[in-house]
Regions:
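Extracellular/secretory-pathway and virion-surface proteins
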Residues: 1-299
Length: 299
């Protein structure tokens, strides 16, 4: 299929002891046709793996409406011309699953092959476990001069502290896509920053590998599939070809005012400032952002 146009639906029955675990990982194998790297066929054309890197998602469907599957659960970027296997820690999302749950998931991607996905639960005595979460802000947007325009995008989130919580954290999954559209090469090859502001406090996520031509090659120990074809070694903003997209987590427990409504604000910046593209030729420079506020209880 085309760009993230292929879907596969699956229903998973969870055991009766999910709540006893404090760690959640996802194993995913993307095995290409013939389980071979991309190759030229003698009769013409190509076999084996797909040529290009593409986004792939696994989304969890609503508990009360299995046909509504808009909540992101996992994100990957496929390889250039090879298969891949990844093990990803998404422990903050434990709150989405309950004992004896029967949940539907939708896998969304662009490349054919055999897809294996497993949920792995374990207990590491980490001392806390997520029990609630809420989506914040819009899903990124065009990084083209109006990313922080609140008449176009929701960039504020009001919340009140839940009772009996132990900690609360920002959990984000952010990647930038599109290049050769402006002087800074946004949003795939520019280091956009993602800033959060609450009650006089601030923190931000950034992507320092984007200017390193071996940035993704250096990420092999963190899951990047090595020896791909194409430009896979180049560092990107929040991702690498042939890698699971990692969550960014930041503890804001000490920022929260438990006695009143809290207003958490978000901005996407470039070099600490509002981004205005220079020498632009139009095109797409999109940031894909999934940002949650996740609450934890002592475990």
């Amino acid at each position: 299929g085309g760009y993230t146009s292929t879907y596969e639906n699956i229903s998973i029955s969870l055991p009766d002891n999910v709540s006893s675990y404090d760690t959640l990982e996802v194993f995913h194998e993307h095995a290409c046709e013939d389980r071979r790297n991309r190759y030229a066929k003698s009769e013409g054309g190509y076999g084996g793996c797909h040529e290009w890197d593409y986004l792939a998602y696994m989304k969890i469907c609503d508990r009360d409406n299995a046909s509504k599957c808009g909540t992101e659960f996992m994100r990957w970027i496929t390889t250039y011309g090879r298969g891949g296997r990844w093990l990803t820690d998404i422990t903050p999302y434990l709150f989405m699953l309950q004992d004896n749950d029967v949940r539907n998931f939708k896998y969304q991607g662009a490349n054919k092959g055999t897809m294996t996905v497993k949920l792995l639960f374990s207990d590491w005595d980490v001392g806390e476990r997520s029990f609630s979460g809420e989506k914040m802000f819009d899903d990124g947007g065009q990084f083209a001069g109006e990313y922080n325009n609140e008449s176009r995008y929701n960039r504020q989130h009001n919340f009140t502290a839940l009772s009996n919580y132990h900690s609360v954290k920002i959990v984000s999954t952010i990647t930038g896509h599109g290049f050769n559209q402006d002087q800074a090469n946004c949003a795939e090859f520019c280091d956009h920053e993602h800033h959060y502001f609450l009650n006089g406090n601030t923190a931000y996520e950034w992507h320092p590998i984007v200017y390193d031509n071996q940035g993704c090659e250096k990420e092999v120990d963190r899951g990047v599939v090595a020896n791909q074809f194409g430009s896979w070694p180049y560092g990107r903003a929040g991702w690498c070809a042939g890698q699971d997209v990692k969550q960014w987590t930041y503890d804001i427990t000490d920022w929260v005012d438990n006695s009143t409504t809290n207003n958490l604000r978000y901005k996407g910046l470039f070099n600490g400032q509002e981004y205005s593209p220079q020498d632009t030729n139009g095109g797409d420079r999109r940031i894909r952002a999934n940002i949650l506020l996740v609450w934890y209880a002592q475990n």
